Amino acid sequence: MNTKFSGKTLVASALVLTTLGTGLHSSYLGLDTNKVVKTAKAEEKMTDGQLWKKVKDSLHDSDIILSNEYETINVTYLLSNGYSSSVSAPGNDDGGHLTQSIDFKGLKQIDLTKENVYDDFNKKLDAKNTWNSLTEKLKGLGLLQNGQKVSIYSSDSSSPVSGKVGEGVTSGGENTLTKRFINKITID
């Protein structure tokens, strides 16, 4: 095998990959560089609807809500300037109409209203598994950080399920939660 040929091939391959990676020759591939730049900039900011949808999907995936029209999800969050704000929509919404750009700093509270609950009326959830699932999903989306205290409240229980992200449940993990009674989640 000719080592000069292999070396030249590697250098040429690296140059091609570097050039394509910078986007200089993306037009050669039929890509529109303006769209690529706009997409990257749009993802730097979040809308209140995108935040709301991430929270709603995490609640649904953790089996806390059904995502139907009989549920209302109100998300209170902290802005980078220190003020707080909130966004609310029914559970069957996609958040697409909520388009206010926000400078998100962190979640504060999630309030849930459930009316006319027919499905899962008596469904019981393992408190520890529910807490772990929700915090894992919210953390994976960048909405929670290690060390934050998260508590899940239920109107049929006097004590919440609480714990610290990255450490686990510290109280109430032995409880079961009746799905329809979960009404508030706080983040400190």
Give the location of each predicted region.
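Gram-negative bacterial Sec-dependent N-terminal signal peptides
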Residues: 1-27
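Mature extracytoplasmic domains of secretory-pathway proteins
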Residues: 83, 88-151, 155-158
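Short, exposed beta-strand-loop hairpins at the edges of beta-sheets
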Residues: 159-180, 185-188
